[in-house]
Amino acid sequence: MTKRALISVSDKNGIVEFAQELTKFGWEIISTGGTKVALDQAGVTTIAIDDVTGFPEMMDGRVKTLHPKIHGGLLARRDLDSHLQAANDHEIGLIDLVVVNLYPFKETILRPDVTYDLAVENIDIGGPSMLRSAAKNHASVTVVVDPADYPTVLGEIAEQGETSYATRQRLAAKVFRHTAAYDALIADYFTKQVGEDKPEKLTITYDLNQPMRYGENPQQNADFYQNALPTAYSIAAAKQLNGKELSFNNIRDADAAIRIIRDFKDRPTVVALKHMNPCGIGQAETIEQAWDYAYEADPVSIFGGIVVLNREVDAATAEKMHPIFLEIIIAPGYSAEALAILTNKKKNLRILELAFDAQDASEVEKEFTGVVGGLLVQDQDVVVESPVDWQVVTERQPSEQEWAAMEFAWKSSKYVKSNGIIITNDKMTLGVGPGQTNRVASVRIAIEQAKDRLEGAVLASDAFFPFADNVEEIAAAGIKAIIQPGGSVRDQDSIDMANKYGLTMVFTGVRHFRH
């Protein structure tokens, strides 16, 4: 019995050559629309879909393959006489191979000029139906959705006259992943169109970006997936100019770095980061000076760390960075001279270029945190704050310099692991106390790191002080200004302690826990 293939593709790369090989093996080819035109023009003999169904394409192509003579040919089980008899009774020819890819829905909704009607018209109905029918009957039918699989299919047909069951099963699994992802994109688009903020079903789809050697530790298997709708300001979108492949930990740290730098747009700023905690942040009038401040903040912890800069890296800055062992440098650009300096004898240094003009758009993405048996979903912590909304709660008002330092410290504190404390002046971080299980311990760590540099320093806390002992420790160190959210039932104790020692303290009203 002559084998039959049904081919209907929007991506025509390689399809002519594929069909030509099938005809050499004696296969009949059924085709539709533009695919049939392309194959006919290439000299491939095809059968029109309406010659099979006896029914014309209609409704602007919306109805063409949704027909029993197509789906019966795909779904008929070859091992059941009743199925074969039904096919014979209704003159349904069996179809042994389906090659289909779908209307470009994703590409359509990414167009800047897309309209709702255009998006809807690019929802494929017949294609997924054929793919799913063929995949369900993979015991007998080969289904191909990816041109990358053409050589495997042709090779097996050439060698043994048909594909192996293992190949058909693998391709069926690929199809179900593909159609599920396609439907997830459509569901996400419609969910956003109707403004559903808490849908009862969460459908998200990600594409494999990079298989990883291992995860956080060598005993953990891992891979890197990126959002199927690409985000322009993301590590997945960064262009790697030098160095080894990014590791699992590199990607997590780099993501933390580009989140931090979003909050520092107005002035040249450099952030040094280690284990997802900032170890040094510097801001100045030039990127070179900002680097100096970030490095000076903690020249020990920066070793083996990640650095992100919000201005193009120039030669002078590169000269200062080059002697330091860094894992990754991220910037919106590099001068040719700077790149030559940074890559000299540094073949493993990962240098990433990332455009910063899409930072605001990246802030609307949800954050996902896996828990055993579930997934937590939240907005990013990107609330817009203004000092005019802050409240001075002490008798002493901040000086102009203290206000500037507190604004800088408050932005920086957002990214320190809770319980998080950070000490800064108006140019650089001086001490970081991250991730302690009690807040006074974080205060002590930050003070110890900042000692001998506390003149004019301020302290920021990501959450309120539960007890006044924190303020007492701060005052004893010589720090004169505190910024914190407030909100404790014992706030007045902290205020009284600040007044006792002549400190100024500001409440922001916004907490910034980070776990």
Curated annotation (Swiss-Prot):
Pfam family, one: MGS
Assigned EC number: 2.1.2.3, 3.5.4.10
GO molecular function terms noted in the UniProt entry: IMP cyclohydrolase activity; phosphoribosylaminoimidazolecarboxamide formyltransferase activity
Gene3D superfamilies: 3.40.140.20, Methylglyoxal synthase-like domain
S-S pairs: none
Top-level taxon: Bacteria
GO BP terms in the entry: 'de novo' IMP biosynthetic process
Annotated keywords: Hydrolase, Multifunctional enzyme, Purine biosynthesis, Transferase
InterPro entries per UniProt: AICAR_Tfase_dup_dom_sf (IPR024051), Cytidine_deaminase-like (IPR016193), MGS-like_dom (IPR011607), MGS-like_dom_sf (IPR036914), PurH-like (IPR002695)
Ranges for domain MGS-like: 1-145
Catalytic activity: (6R)-10-formyltetrahydrofolate + 5-amino-1-(5-phospho-beta-D-ribosyl)imidazole-4-carboxamide = 5-formamido-1-(5-phospho-D-ribosyl)imidazole-4-carboxamide + (6S)-5,6,7,8-tetrahydrofolate; IMP + H2O = 5-formamido-1-(5-phospho-D-ribosyl)imidazole-4-carboxamide
Pathway recorded for this protein: Purine metabolism; IMP biosynthesis via de novo pathway; 5-formamido-1-(5-phospho-D-ribosyl)imidazole-4-carboxamide from 5-amino-1-(5-phospho-D-ribosyl)imidazole-4-carboxamide (10-formyl THF route): step 1/1; Purine metabolism; IMP biosynthesis via de novo pathway; IMP from 5-formamido-1-(5-phospho-D-ribosyl)imidazole-4-carboxamide: step 1/1
Regions annotated as coiled coil: none
GO CC terms, sorted: cytosol
Comment block on domains: The IMP cyclohydrolase activity resides in the N-terminal region.
Similarity-based family: Belongs to the PurH family.
Name of the protein described by the UniProt record: Bifunctional purine biosynthesis protein PurH
Organism (species): Streptococcus suis
Lineage: Bacteria, Bacillati, Bacillota, Bacilli, Lactobacillales
